[in-house]
Amino acid sequence: MLLPGPARQPPTPQPVQHPGLRRQVEPPGQLLRLFYCTVLVCSKEISALTDFSGYLTKLLQNHTTYACDGDYLNLQCPRHSTISVQSAFYGQDYQMCSSQKPASQREDSLTCVAATTFQKVLDECQNQRACHLLVNSRVFGPDLCPGSSKYLLVSFKCQPNELKNKTVCEDQELKLHCHESKFLNIYSATYGRRTQERDICSSEAERLPPFDCLSYSALQVLSRRCYGKQRCKIIVNNHHFGSPCLPGVKKYLTVTYACVPKNILTAIDPAIANLKPSLKQKDGEYGINFDPSGSKVPRKDGILVSNSLAAFAYIRAHPERAALLFVSSVCIGLALTLCALVIRESCAKDFRDLQLGREQLVPGSDKVEEDSEDEEEEEDSSESDFPGELSGFCRTSYPVYSSIEAAELAERIERREQIIQEIWMNSGLDTSLPRNMGQFY
């Protein structure tokens, strides 16, 4: 025997969804997915450009590293760049590699310095992307302080593979110039002469050096003189760069530099922003030759890239604010587009209504009058063909009418007056003829 269970409630009928409603809901979902895709793509582009900004920062900064005796000194630069050694020191320092400093060796720390350190590091690491150098006293020549703890300190830059190079002979003027919003950054400079380079600044009475005589202190001189400026000039002589070669040897200065955007260089070295802009020079100085037929507007190379990098760096630092501004701008754009569509539709509707109202105000008799006038004009044109030919043949300056033509003209005028009178009667106006109608009689 079956016991009666709890009565089941009938299923509630679900409202039938109209297909038109579904079409109205789908576009916002598509817009939302499109917005998500745009945000993902923009975030990838932002991270890529921020990495590029970090890459430029690594190229502009001075890197310093050290290693103690028995260790390896590792120098590394990013892709598409090489090592440019700025300075090197090998000697004693008990604070770096030793916890205790014996009292008997306090005065020896000043004399325990290897003079060949810089040249050795140049030979091993210059223009290399990576360098691994074993720190040992035998690598840098005779040990001046046997038994003491020493270390190697190297300062270097990562110079891009594509840089500007300039060579100026002795007793000539070096001129460096960057365009607006860019500043000079000196990567390397040498003053002297190499034995293999015979074609640079050569002359018949020149005395060639028996060995390479180069002064690397030219880098410090040019950095103090030209770093962070748009224009720089200096006379290449022994007074500024010393005399590394024997008397009678013709020397030259070789400079490797780059023009860096202001925003990036200022972010690395804030002191650049406090520098006063250089005074305007006369035409022809610093290698600037203005063409009268050309544009006098200064070039803006690199401004777009530098401003974009600064903008993306700000967006990466403030993602919430950037997202809020982006969503707000999208909403404002959609609102303006909607307003434009509404105004366009309403104006089009008003124009159609106005046109229909004008068509209703025009009476049907006017159309009849226009048709009759068109027919009369056609008749006049057809009838006036032959008289026109006669008048052209006889060369008369006044019209000639016969009795038949006068009768037809009077009949046409009378018929026109009847049509006009009928039009006035249909429109409910006064049926009396105007005064000027009597002039036709």
From Swiss-Prot:
Q: Which UniProt keywords apply?
A: Cell membrane, Glycoprotein, Lectin, Membrane, Repeat, Signal, Transmembrane, Transmembrane helix
Q: How does it sit in the membrane?
A: Single-pass membrane protein
- Renumbered to this chain, region (Disordered) spans 1-23, 362-391
UniProt topological domain (Extracellular) ranges: 49-322
Name of a matching Pfam family: FAM176
InterPro entries named in the record: EVA1_dom, Lectin_gal-bd_dom, Lectin_gal-bd_sf
What domain of life? Eukaryota
Q: Provide the transmembrane region boundaries.
A: 323-343
Annotated localization: Cell membrane
Pro residues biased stretches? 7-16
Similarity field: Belongs to the EVA1 family.
- What name has this protein been given in UniProt? Protein eva-1 homolog C
Organism of derivation: Pan troglodytes
Gene encoding this chain?
A: EVA1C
